[in-house]
């Protein structure tokens, strides 16, 4: 798609979604779709078999397939399919070696996607611009870059892969939605993106992961509360979820990041003292929907009460 047609695409998306969101966020969403479309094309050609071992999850999945695109999500989050078994290895050293063996071909296949879709990426694991490793190889963060058609600057897209997640629910394959559905107009301006098929987290797994994120991040991200609010409003009552299961999900995160235990203690203290809730995560610039502030505040109060109940389980 050339620059002139891309401007038409942005206008079409804004008109379709009835939003005045800034062009740069529409472009980032488009580039994520380009990356995923290229992934599917290479997958169909049988050239990236190791990427089939990744299970899609997170805010991008929620936005695209469960919540009818209420906001732009900027990242791609995955869990390795064998993460439950990797957790069973008895030593950190054995886990690290097993993860290293698995990540190498995954990185090479991400590079194939980048080369075909004209994203910048370097497979050198010492180059932190492109690859970051956290928590004894439990989590790999890959950053790929594409030149903006609007500004000419590099646009980063973060891909996070977790190798030590405890998955509690079965995962099935679904087709991932794009922000717009292919039609004659889009075809006329050169839009020809495929929709990728991934194995994905079910909604229940994402809900308990959102609870864990809220209670164990170093700092609250408003998007986690916002996502639970929208799930509760449109899909399922998140306030009725089993606290014991949520706490098991929280405990499972300590192997991924030991700091989460201290963060839980800190956040539970803030909740108890009425000081929890500060966030510098401004999601208004990413939102495509209007939110009833009264309803949102009421849900947040109910959510915080539930979080306090979960905190009592950590004593």
Which residue stretches match the model-derived regions?
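Glycine-rich beta-strand-to-loop/alpha-helix junction loops that act as flexible
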Residues: 56-60
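Structured mid-to-C-terminal alpha-helical surface segments
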Residues: 1-54, 64-74, 80-315
């Amino acid at each position: 798609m050339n620059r002139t047609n891309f401007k038409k695409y942005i206008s079409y998306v804004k008109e379709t979604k009835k939003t005045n969101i800034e062009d740069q966020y529409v472009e980032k969403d488009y580039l994520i779709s380009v990356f995923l479309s290229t992934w599917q094309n290479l997958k169909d050609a049988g050239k990236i078999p190791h990427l089939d071992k990744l299970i899609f999850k997170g805010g991008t999945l929620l936005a695209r397939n469960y919540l009818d695109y209420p906001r732009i999500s900027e990242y791609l989050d995955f869990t390795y399919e064998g993460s439950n078994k990797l957790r069973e290895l008895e030593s950190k050293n054995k886990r690290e070696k097993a993860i290293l063996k698995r990540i190498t071909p995954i990185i090479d296949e991400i590079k194939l996607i980048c080369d075909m879709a004209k994203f910048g990426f370097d497979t050198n694991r010492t180059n932190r611009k492109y690859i970051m490793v956290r928590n004894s190889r439990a989590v790999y963060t890959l950053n790929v870059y594409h030149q903006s058609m609007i500004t000419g600057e590099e646009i980063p897209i973060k891909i996070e892969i977790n190798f030590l997640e405890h998955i509690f629910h079965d995962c099935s394959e679904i087709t991932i939605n794009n922000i717009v559905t292919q039609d004659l107009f889009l075809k006329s301006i050169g839009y020809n993106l495929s929709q990728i098929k991934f194995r994905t987290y079910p909604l229940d797994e994402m809900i308990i992961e959102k609870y864990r994120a809220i209670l164990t991040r170093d700092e609250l991200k408003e998007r986690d509360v916002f996502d639970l609010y929208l799930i509760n409003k449109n899909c399922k009552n998140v306030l009725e979820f089993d606290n014991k299961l949520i706490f098991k999900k929280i405990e499972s995160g300590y192997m991924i990041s030991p700091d989460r235990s201290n963060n839980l203690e800190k956040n539970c203290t803030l909740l108890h003292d009425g000081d929890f809730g500060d966030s510098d995560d401004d999601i208004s610039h990413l939102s495509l929907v209007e939110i009833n502030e009264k309803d949102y505040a009421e849900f947040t109060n109910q959510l915080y009460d539930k979080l306090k109940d979960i905190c009592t389980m950590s004593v």
